[in-house]
Amino acid sequence: LIANGWLVAGVDFNAERQAELTAQWPDDSYRAYVGDITDEAFVKESVADIATLGHIDLLINNAGQPSFKVPTAYEAADVDKCLKGLKGMILWTVETLKACGEQNVKIAQIMSTAATRGNANESVYCATKWGEKGYTKSLQAAYKGTSVKVVAVYPGGIDTAFYRDSRDYVSEAKQHTFMQPGPLAEVILFNLINEANLTVTDIEINRN
């Protein structure tokens, strides 16, 4: 996005990573916001501040944490952990829509192929992703025919640190056979930012 001349506002709970990005890019290219995406006060304050920079053209909701266990091993903490992604998606979407006056904005919900099927040992994670899909589909119906465009993205199997706490489920060797995040991001962005008079509403991307 920055390479295409966009001003990007990035949100993360990782202050160290945000400091690295802030050092890498000038203020007119990147603004960092550090906090909990499920903290409503933080969301409201952040969106209000971002809106002072100009109209918000694109919101990308990409947060999520995995929990891979056999069905009987799940506890309440696992459910809460997975649901943070859904709650954050809703809060950021609502505040962004308000800030934009529900006009001229594209919202990309980055979910997972787990939102399209049931996977063994991912019951709670799948339940959360199906919830995100349901929310996204409802938004698409609510804003059909308007200048609010909602895009559902379902990528599956990406070579990142996402699986670092689940090595009994996805080994490091297996992880490295998954999609690379760079080319995946390029494919997603190609569909999100272009001059064509169309919107690709659903994108499912599977590894080879």
Predicted regions and their residues:
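Residue(s) in the substrate-gating loop at a strand-loop-helix junction
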Residues: 112
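Rossmann-fold scaffold of SDR-type NAD(P)-dependent oxidoreductases
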Residues: 56-64, 85, 109, 151
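C-terminal helical subdomain
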Residues: 148, 152, 172-208
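Conserved mid-core segment of classical short-chain dehydrogenase/reductases
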Residues: 44, 65-78, 121-124, 163
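Conserved glycine-rich Rossmann-like NAD(P)H-binding loop of the short-chain dehydrogenase/reductase
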Residues: 6-18
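Catalytic Tyr-X3-Lys loop
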Residues: 65, 72-91, 108, 132
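Amphipathic alpha-helical dimer-interface segment in Rossmann-like NAD(P)H-dependent oxidoreductases
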Residues: 48, 52, 84-104, 141
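Active-site-adjacent segment of SDR/Rossmann-fold oxidoreductases
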Residues: 100, 117, 138-148
